[in-house]
Amino acid sequence: MLPRIEALREIIWRFDNHSCVVSPLGYITRDLFSITAELRERCFYCMGSMGSVIPLALGISLARPQVHVLAIEGDGSLLMNLGALVTLRRYNTGQISLFVFDNRCYESTGCQPSQPDGFNIEDICGAMGLQTYVAKEPRHIEEFFKMRKASSEPTGVLVIKVALAPPSARVDEAPREIASRFSKWLCETSRTH
């Protein structure tokens, strides 16, 4: 299992000029916010909503096909909108990389179990027809990115097994400010590419 913040760093340092990230509510976004000060214009932190990452990532990729969207989702948040996986399978043109952080619980609200015994998020993603891979070490994330770069097809989903960990500080920006800054970046990106 990887520490959550280490997994985020492994993803984020691979950003390029055509990348943005969409993240879910809770500890994932708090950690992401703490390590992306210089990239915040390209980060959409979903605060206060579960199950919205995939629909937002799809909207961005369809409206701005030149943008590579790194969609980071938690296992609990993904379970709130499993239908989004079917939509992702249907409409992903290859510009979305989905990362599911799986700690098997709703960590942000007290670690209530998110999945029954014998249930695996990667099996659900695979059943939806998505190529699904599992990461338990940093090298697995690197291998996923190499595979994505070498393929013209959508690379599917990387389920990252993450360990429980104390969160970073709360996001200290208002959702309106986050949305405005991100929208501005998207508009500028469409003019320059």
Task: Mark where each language-model region is.
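Non-catalytic terminal/interface segments that mediate subunit docking, oligomerization
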Residues: 12-16
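N-terminal, charge-rich interaction modules
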Residues: 4, 18-20
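Acidic-glycine-rich active-site phosphate/pyrophosphate-binding loop
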Residues: 20-39
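Thiamine diphosphate
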Residues: 2-9, 34-189
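Generic C-terminal helix-cap and adjacent flexible tail
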Residues: 191-193
